[in-house]
Amino acid sequence: DIVLPSAHWFEQVDLGFLFSTHPYLLWQDSQYFLHLNRWNSTSGVWQDCYTGTELAQYADIAADNSGVYVTYTTGSFPYVLHAFRFDNAAGTVSLLGDVIADNACNMEIAAANGSIGIGYRDLNDNNVPKLAVWDGTAWNTTTLSEQDCGTISVLADGNSIWVVPSGGKTDVFRWESGTVTNIPLPEAVQGRAFQMTPAVAQGNFYMTVNAQNPEEFVLYGLNKDGTWSLTGNPIAQSMVNQPVLAAQKQALYCLYATSDLQMQLKKLTLETETPAVTGDVNGDGTANLADTVLLQKYLLGETALTAAQAKAADLQADDSINGFDLAVLRQLLTKVA
């Protein structure tokens, strides 16, 4: 078991993982000062990485293979939005730019293959949802909708960032390489989606919808043509509290609290995918010269790979993509020919 850091009171707790295995804990104490800890598996203790010195009402954490990223607000009102990066190797904290927004809340942060995105509700602009993306030197902010929203969920998916504002007035948004795609909500929940929680499984996007009037808690999957389908039976015939949606292999797991504060965990087993073709880097169902070209461009730094493409390109299964994988692919195609 991993014991939480000693504290008189936890106001909010978030968990992030570096390299998918190293736990980081972001929490606020009774004064709403921010703390970042990392777990030392050798000594069995939480190590201090960062301690804030001013009020932080809202905060969230994300991580990728290069660092841990934290977004937070300062002040009791307005809530000034900031972000920093913790360098695991150096043990240092560096601010990412200056102020991101003068008055924001309900934000979440995601790290998508080097792109850092923060979705937030702008309290100085009629509560509309916005997305700020860090380009390495500055924040580029996009207003996603002119309609107001409540909470905002953000999810990294390969090179993409999904932004899901609650309230049922806005679309779902997908950002990739500076381009935002709008996906209208399912018609049945427009205007009554109190809360939505996203996940990606087997390359497909899913979201739970906590709906009002009538009350129900359902799961939708996004089809390839941009339409939505109800997935499985309703999770609950009532509104729920604090839902969490997560994907693991061929299943989706949903954890939530019922109206009488009972915890429920539901599992949905997804259809098994067709076995992958070895060497099919671009995902078109066959291994051919196009896969070699794509992998070579990636190694030359001319293009990026999605998470699925990167998995297919790791032909040596050593958690890295390099010239040896390209050599294996060429040898494989020679045998096929």
Predicted regions and their residues:
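Cellulosome-associated attachment modules in secreted, modular CAZymes
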Residues: 272-337
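Extracellular, repeat-based ectodomains that mediate carbohydrate processing or recognition
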Residues: 1-273
